[in-house]
């Protein structure tokens, strides 16, 4: 009552009212920001002023029996005063030091089992070899990569059920462990973690790391398997790269590799059977990789590869709308087209029946050593922005894009007959015939393409028909970017401040 009276008196003074209403804290938004919710809004500041206090930590009362009131230097470790608002004790940071030095020790047998991913990482790094360092312009492409080596391939839901069963077996809630891998992992982990004294929540977090694939969309210049991604910060910078050989394999990378090989074999065998779809599905169901059914792996594994995508599509799973041509993965990022058969005449007067894509489209092209953005209309290349490791890689990308554009001047640049065959001695389709022809020799293609004067745009340069760089002229519609061009992620929202494409600001 006394306090309320005092506050009333204060409020009756005009100065008090002025201070409270005219200062910036009167903004309701600011008050709300710092007082609503339990989330700490300024952790660094909070930590600073807490640590300036003598007893910034609260602990259970049992601490008084376990820790002496003073340490060897006579400094007070805990205060007899209770924490306001709870029946806990106020404790000094010195108590933590005392506990770490003199507190009880426990068996460490479970640590390597729970923190297995970390122990394995240390081993991989110990046995890996680093060096030498090369200084050169790094062409990085943002790709979806696997960031935790050594994981199983369970879905988030499957992993959640396994974790609940292992860590909190007595909790209520229906858990259905159906897949072979779920049952095996649960049995194995229950045995490993018997009498484990590590906090259950920590065990749950670590299990999640071991069981679920985690992916991120990161700029990468070299290897994309998870054992390379875990050392990305050591192997590539903006203008340098360090050679690295991992000190061990991990099963998820092996599975990804095996999946690609298995899918390719299955697709190859299915194409020659009487009923390709039925035969492909039958093979997918009867194949196992590392003891796990291939169909289960296909459901979880995000590997993007042509044969893997064919198997996924056959099973009715969603696949990304990318396709391969000339060693590049094309992803349409905007526009649309319809296909129409058209007969065209080559420079050798040979008739080719090609499927023309009518309409405006934009693509990203991603290859091993070069990447590009391609904008095209019906049988016309509008713009190609390419970046690559070297002249050869850039030339490869330009040839593929020129053929893909289906321009008339490309078809007229053909000299001689097109009669390329595949390994089974079957004639290749016309688009691949054209591609093979120009991959052998692109001189006429580049000469016939035409050149244009270019504007001076930062980070961009022209390229002449003999593949030498130029700041004045360039092949029509073609520019070379010094920065990488990112692989497009359809699943990730593009933040406005970090453009997916290194040169979008220039277009």
UniProtKB/Swiss-Prot annotation:
Q: What is an example of a Pfam family matching this protein? A: Flu_PB2_3rd
Ligase among keywords = no
Give the source's domain of life in one word.
Viruses
Q: Which UniProt keywords apply?
A: Host cytoplasm, Host mitochondrion
Where, subcellularly, is it found?
Host mitochondrion; Host cytoplasm, Host cytosol
Q: One GO CC annotation, please? A: host cell mitochondrion
Please give the chief subcellular localization of this protein. host cell
- What task does this protein carry out? May participate in the inhibition of type I interferon induction through inhibition of the host mitochondrial antiviral signaling protein MAVS. The knockout of PB2-S1 has no detectable effects on laboratory infected mice.
Its recorded name reads PB2-S1
Q: Which organism is it from?
A: Influenza A virus (strain A/Duck/Germany/1949 H10N7)
Q: What is the lineage of its organism?
A: Viruses, Riboviria, Orthornavirae, Negarnaviricota, Polyploviricotina
